[in-house]
Swiss-Prot record:
Keywords: Disulfide bond, Protease inhibitor, Secreted, Serine protease inhibitor, Signal. The lineage of its organism: Eukaryota, Metazoa, Chordata, Craniata, Vertebrata. Residues 90-93 form a propeptide. Negative results: does not inhibit plasmin, and pancreatic kallikrein. This is Kunitz-type serine protease inhibitor 3. The record marks L41, A42 as: Reactive bond for chymotrypsin. Residues 31-81 form the BPTI/Kunitz inhibitor domain. It is found in: Secreted. Residues 1-24 form the signal peptide. PANTHER family: BPTI_KUNITZ INHIBITOR DOMAIN-CONTAINING PROTEIN (PTHR10083:SF383), KUNITZ-TYPE PROTEASE INHIBITOR-RELATED (PTHR10083).
Length: 93
């Protein structure tokens, strides 16, 4: 296979890995933590993974403390925590 073909294959595999949501058994443990706004009073719209509904939901992060189940974007939350085969919509609290 030519170097151009190998480069194309590598690019396609990388794209596939980025677009494939995580499977249930590979989900990080922090995805099961509850939403935690922290102790500070900033107003930072964020997303957390709700394991009961298998959806990423909006919440307001205060800017400090909290926990690792806190994502700046819905896509980041979905790619990290949502089980494969399910394409949930953005859900509000």
């Amino acid at each position: 296979m030519s170097s151009g073909g190998l480069l194309l294959l590598l690019g396609l595999l990388t794209l596939w890995a980025e677009l494939t949501p995580v499977s249930t058994r590979d989900r990080p443990k922090f995805c099961y933590l509850p939403a935690d706004p922290g102790r500070c009073l900033a107003y930072m719209p964020s997303f957390y993974y709700d394991s009961a509904s298998n959806k990423c939901k909006k919440f307001i992060y205060g800017g400090c403390r909290g926990n690792a189940n806190n994502f700046k974007t819905w896509d980041e939350c979905r790619h990290t925590c949502v089980a494969s085969g399910i394409q949930p919509r953005i859900a509000s609290n």
